[in-house]
């Protein structure tokens, strides 16, 4: 800035930096006025936190026009996305305004949103940064700031964006017996804000193998403390727990899930992806899911990520066949219509978001209209904490 420009800006004109600061304060006050009392107080106590950067982010999202591919299907269903990460494994995101644009294109009116509780490390020996947890063999680590990124960014949004999301907290190590204490602190910092807990990682093949510390398992004492807290607070818990290891058809980890479900029947657990991940290939998954749902009234499942492409549509990359067809899955859902939900499992970037949402139309077209309403919206709404 030249001396002349500095002198000019010191007069009646307002500099761009000062304008952003003042605009952020005004946005904060307006946003806080529409929030529940506890959350409004939390917002008011954070002058200049994420609000100024949010205003810049909105402008950037508009100016650079983040590419979002429109769906190839005509929108026919109103969906609540039950599984959506606001950030990727580098804790980066295209932001809420672009996400809402993608949701609008896909016919998704609301979403359960959470961060990424595990971050990918960029090792000093690597010239190129990773872009995904499988980019290289660098380690991953638990990242507690992810909850604050989600909370601050969401609180910074105008009401019409904020009211579309149900935030879950996930930034803790569930192996730690202090995990429930950490979650309680986050709940206290953002009162009447969090609608659930998750996605928590347990038995996530390469991801948990790359993460510092012992491999997490859903029936460990840290998890059990989370379940007790969730039951007391009325919060559902979303857990990724593989049904078995990679490259074996033996079901190795099912008993851990059963013990977790039996531990506290007042804790409602959502089983992410029906226990499936990359290279997890088993026979009879519909039978396993059916038996679990019959025996555990506190279990729900989300259909998201690879389980739909591989197991519902038989699109395994190696032509593996698990023995079940799309009709078998539709029949299972009709037997338990109040226990399923669908999600995109997108991670921070929204270019292909519409395609991930409308891909479920092939399944939805096979279901009764009442069942469609349940798995597209009502089941998730019945679970999440309402204030």
Q: What name fits each language-model region?
A:
Residues 88-129:
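N-terminal carbohydrate-binding/catalytic regions of secreted carbohydrate-active enzymes
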Residues 35-45:
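Signal peptide processing junction and immediate N-terminal pro/mature segment
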């Amino acid at each position: 800035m030249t001396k002349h420009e500095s002198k000019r800006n010191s007069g009646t004109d307002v500099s761009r930096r000062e304008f952003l600061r003042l605009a952020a304060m005004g946005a904060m006050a307006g946003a806080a006025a529409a929030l529940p009392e506890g959350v409004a107080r939390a917002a008011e106590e954070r002058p200049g936190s994420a609000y100024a950067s949010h205003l810049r982010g909105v402008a950037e999202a508009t100016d650079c026009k983040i590419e979002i591919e429109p769906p190839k299907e005509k929108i026919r269903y109103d969906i609540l996305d039950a599984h959506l990460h606001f950030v990727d494994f580098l804790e980066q995101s295209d932001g809420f305004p672009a996400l809402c644009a993608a949701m609008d294109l896909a016919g998704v009116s609301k979403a359960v949103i959470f961060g990424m509780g595990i971050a990918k490390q960029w090792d000093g020996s690597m010239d190129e940064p990773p872009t995904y947890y499988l980019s290289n063999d660098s380690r991953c680590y638990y990242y507690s700031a992810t909850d604050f990124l989600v909370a601050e960014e969401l609180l910074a949004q105008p009401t019409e964006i904020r009211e579309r999301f149900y935030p879950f907290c996930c930034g803790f190590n569930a192996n730690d017996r202090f995990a429930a204490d950490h979650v309680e602190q986050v709940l206290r910092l953002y009162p009447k804000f969090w609608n659930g807990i998750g996605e928590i990682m347990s038995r996530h093949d390469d991801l948990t193998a790359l993460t510092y510390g012992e491999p997490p398992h859903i029936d460990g004492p840290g998890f059990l403390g989370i379940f007790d807290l969730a039951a007391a607070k009325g919060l559902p818990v979303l857990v990724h727990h593989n049904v078995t290891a990679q490259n074996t058809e033996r079901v190795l980890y099912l008993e851990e899930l059963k013990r977790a479900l039996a531990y506290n029947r007042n804790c409602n657990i959502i089983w992410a992806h029906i226990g499936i991940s990359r290279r997890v290939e088993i026979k009879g998954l519909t039978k396993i899911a059916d038996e679990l749902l019959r025996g555990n009234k506190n279990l729900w499942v989300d259909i998201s990520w690879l389980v739909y492409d591989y197991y519902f549509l038989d699109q395994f990359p190696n032509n593996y066949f698990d023995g079940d067809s799309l009709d078998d899955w539709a029949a299972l859902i009709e037997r338990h219509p109040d226990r399923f939900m669908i999600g995109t499992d997108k991670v921070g970037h929204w270019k292909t978001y519409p395609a991930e949402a409308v891909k479920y139309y092939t399944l939805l077209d096979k279901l009764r209209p009442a069942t469609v309403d349940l798995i597209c919206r009502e089941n998730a709404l019945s679970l999440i904490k309402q204030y």
